[in-house]
Amino acid sequence: MKKRLIAPMLLSAASLAFFAMSGSAQAAAYTDYSLYKVEPSNTFSTESQASQAVAKLEKDTGWDASYQASGTTTTYQISASGIHSESEAKAILSGLAKQTSITGTSSPVGSKQPYVTISSGAISGEKQANTILAKLKQETGVAGAVKAYGAAQPYMNVMTSDIADETKVKALIQSLAKQTGIKSSYQPITHTVSVTTIQSGTIVGDSRAAQIKNAFQKESGLQASLKETVKGQAYYTFTTAAISGEANAKTLLQQLKQSTGITGSYKSINQKTTVESYNVQSAYFKGLSTVKDAISQIKKNTGVSGSYQQVGKSTSYTVNMKGITKQQLQKIDTFFKKKKWHYTSSSVKKTTTSAAYQITTAKILGEQQANKAAAFFAQKKVKAAKTAAGSTAENQYQLISEETSDQAKVTKGLNILKKNQLSASAKSVKKQIADTFKITTESLLDQTKVNQALTFFKSNHISVASQKTGQTAASSYQITTEAIISQEEIDRVLTFFKQNHIAVTTSKTGQTAYTQYKIVTTQLSSKTALNNGLTYLKSKSVTPSYTTKSNTLYKISVNEQFTGNDTAAAASTKLKQLYGWTSSIVKIKNGPQIMKTNYNLSLRDMVQKQMTVSPQTDGAAYVSLTYINTATSTVTADVLNIRSTPEVSPTNVIGQFKKGDKVKVIGQINGWAKINLGWRNASSDEVVQYVDPNNFSRDSKYYFQFLKLSQTAGLSVTEVNQKVLAGKGILTGRAKAFIDAANQYSINELYLISHALLETGNGTSALANGLTYNGKTVYNMYGIGAYDSNPNYYGAKYAYEQGWFTPEAAIIGGAKFIGSSYIHNTAYNQDTLYKMRWSATATHQYATDIGWAYKQVNRMYSLYSLLDGYTLYFDVPEYR
């Protein structure tokens, strides 16, 4: 009994071939071929702006664009008055833009007014004038400048005679400033005098130096200090190790004195020397000749002589070597190891006493001399020990007195040093000393201040005089305001000077300007912006008002169509970069999504692989009419090539006729007879026609052989019910079940529907409309499990076992079977008609007919032709 198994698209090939599949095809991502529009969201408040934007867009991008009205909007415009200057108007506009992002323009109101300056009369003193000017600025907000007024007057200094006491000078300066406010300074008056310093000779010892210093200061009246001239140092001696030979000791002493000036002596000492040697005895040697030979080898290889000794009365002997050195023992050890001989050794120590000499230096003062001795012995390679001698030399000092011009004190000092048996000297030098001082006031312009200074010093019994400094300055000053135009400012300045009892004059500058300005904002598109603008302007003490206006809005349309979402997104990004516009991307037509799978083969290699499994075709063949007897339809040549195309080519020969063979001629073309062979082997030229994907254009129905059956197309339930399943018996209105099944098991919706339509006879079969099995009504929409001997019984039995008790359950359950058995079979990975026919390994191919995939597309294509809303996914092979 034969079981009916559903095969993809109901295979109609001449024969089927199933083999194990292997391969390494690599799929890329999908390329979107849907059509999109890019719709900018920006609007323009005037038609002129929109028109200019379209023109610029077309120029910048080359895209076709247009604009159209897009509703209306209300705008607001604020105006404000009560502004007194252009700078104030600009400042308000700047603040308005910063605080609210509202921009606008300013313009003058009324006629121009003249600028004026206001000048004061004479003011005594520059300081007083600057004080009044600062007060003017503070109270009126009007700035100005101070300038000299009238003839220049000389600056004066007041200078005292010499004053001996510096403390008194400082007190007078402080008192002058306190009483008159006049600052002054003082300068020392210097004189040349001779001063003498006493210096003593060397004083040895700390206590003696301190004693002489105290006596000197007490008896001479001069202060003195002690300068350390020589630092006290320690004494050392050096004692050498044993020196062999008295002559060597004498010679070394002489060299020490010549080299360093250091003397010494030597003495005889006893020197004990311990010498270590070794006695070696070998292991046994058998026979006298053997031991003698060993002694000879030892002598030759180590240089050590030995003797032999018999072991008892045996024929064995040992080699004995006595009094050998450590170096000789090492040679013996190396040689014996090389010969693999054994030995024992023992150490022997011997002490001898001999006469030697030892040098001891005289006492050496200080580290410097001691280092010379150490360096000498080190150079002579004689070991010597340094020892402190237990005593030190005393420090040495020199007494130095303070400077004095009193010769009596100098004489006393010299006598005191001589009395203490010390040499002494007196050194005199000329020096400038300051013993009087002179006070000079700051430069004074006001004669009143000069008189105050003169009176002050005279009242303190100090001789004093005034003198010109050579500099002059004005004694009276005038204030002149900056140019002002506002009547309010003019009135404030005049009132200020009047209150301060200062006469003034007003002068026109010759310049004019506006004194009133107004501000007008741009059109505002929201109430929020309007309120923000009004609030800000009121805070600046101006009077704002506003008007409203209804405006037509304009919107730009980009009329270009973009293939693929990525291309549309790039266009949207370009608009953002060029103009700052945001855009929405709208799909206007579903297009195919195409991926390319690289088979890692050349097209030639693929065809050669397919030729090894004998691909079949029922297409016509061709033979040359020259060798056909058309009357009898027989071959006249001994051998006649049968070709797949009406031309001579090395790749289109598919067989041969012999002389006398009968042929069935079904047509003629350019000297070729078109014949019918039924199913036959295909030529490589015929195979390449179907294998090469470039032979099928994307807009032809045959492109559906690349349709990815493992990908849903996003169909509409309503559209499928209305256009595909209407009038299809039990399947009518079941689009949702098919679409749910497709989504659940990742299968193309129309692939499932086409199976169901074919298996159920467009929804009319008994299995599809429900059969009773074991008391339950069951449904089978794909004929799964139905044996040819009794398809209704076995199809119902299979449906019962699967629990398909509703049409929907049968549709969805059958989809699971189809998906796991065919579409998603991981062993073969054949989810397109092309892959089912043309495996990269030429194995597990669903048919031998080279046109199988080509012929299967008609039903799928016809169903999709009924629909509008879908997205198709294609997987197209790619050959090297």
Swiss-Prot record:
Gene Ontology CC: extracellular region
Main location: secreted
GO MF entries: amidase activity; mannosyl-glycoprotein endo-beta-N-acetylglucosaminidase activity; peptidoglycan binding
Activity modulation: Inhibited by diethyl pyrocarbonate, slightly by EDTA. Not inhibited by PMSF, diisopropyl fluorophosphate, 2-mercaptoethanol or N-ethylmaleimide.
Keyword RNA-binding applies: no
Enzyme class: hydrolase
Sequence repeat boundaries on the chain: 439-473, 479-513
Entry annotated with the keyword tRNA-binding: no
UniProt protein name: Beta-N-acetylglucosaminidase
Organism expressing this protein natively: Bacillus subtilis (strain 168)
Taxonomy of the source species: Bacteria, Bacillati, Bacillota, Bacilli, Bacillales
